[in-house]
Design a protein with these regions (language model features):
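Ribonuclease/tRNase effector modules and their secretory precursors
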Residues: 1-87
Length: 87
């Protein structure tokens, strides 16, 4: 998989949520990840993928796909409702 992101947004995300986009991309290696369409956005298809990084951190990554490249928009620790993913 190929990834891209805006460098300023990545720095802002790291400062706000403590997760870098390079680290967030590891969610896509989790075979148990869950991806849902984010219906709030109508200008492009955005998805939220929740999965584990290094078997210790559950993260939700908001992303879109452009010309076969996954563009990471944001990443944050998953909310409690997603922690059932690990059961």
């Amino acid at each position: 998989m190929n990834f891209e992101w805006d460098a300023h947004k990545a720095a802002s995300n790291l400062a706000k949520d403590g997760i870098g986009f390079e680290e967030a991309a590891l969610v896509f290696a989790d075979s148990r990840r869950l991806t849902l369409v984010d219906a709030r956005h109508q200008t492009e298809i955005r998805e939220n993928t929740t999965g584990m990084i290094a078997e210790i951190l559950i993260v939700t990554v908001t992303h879109t796909e452009r010309k076969g490249v996954i563009r990471i928009i944001s990443a944050r620790p998953a909310r409690k409702r997603y922690h059932a993913h690990d059961s």
